[in-house]
């Protein structure tokens, strides 16, 4: 069998409660936020399964329908750290026939979505295939909206951000006059990446029911920000953001627009035999190696 290579970009998802104080407003059976957070990954995959079983109903704002299919594990009730889905949307093609006429057909180019649902990893690998979707960020916007419509019923919301090398930030600001930096950080609930943030920042976000914390650094008129690698506070914010914890935007001298630093998303490749096997768990090893995680 010919092995096709599929290329992916890596994102981190974090699942947060919408309201930490009033569980009774939702349909939850959980008695506390702690109980809800313990089951958040179950609800996340349940939301994906709902998309698969209800694709025929998909309709958001009159836009084109999306369809989803689960390919691993085969049974919905199985709980696995690796979950693989297909996602497709229709495109109209014009075919010229042998009687010199034309007819419209529906083409459904698809991509793979790999979900690593370990609560200490929470990775979403999105296949890059421009014939199906213009970018992986476009895919993230579409699935985030649909997943949150479902998760919201259980007082949950998912935030999905790209993973990239923090060196991208330092390379970008090198030898530039920096006027503003904006950090937009998701309230952390994953120990392995939130260790970069101070306890004060984490506690403030959680106790105030904050989903996203915005930190803005603005230089005074006629001056520039001083951003050094040995500034542990800045380093921690960059570290957390680059691991999928949020977004970073930078404005340089003489440029009106901000530059998004979360470009150059971390990539991985996987062959079709691995994706379609009965035990694709070595995908976790591939991702761990790329991200330098255990």
Description of each model-found segment:
Residues 72-127, 132:
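Long, hydrophobic/aromatic-enriched structural stretches that serve as scaffold segments
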Residues 1-92, 133-294:
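Terminal interaction module
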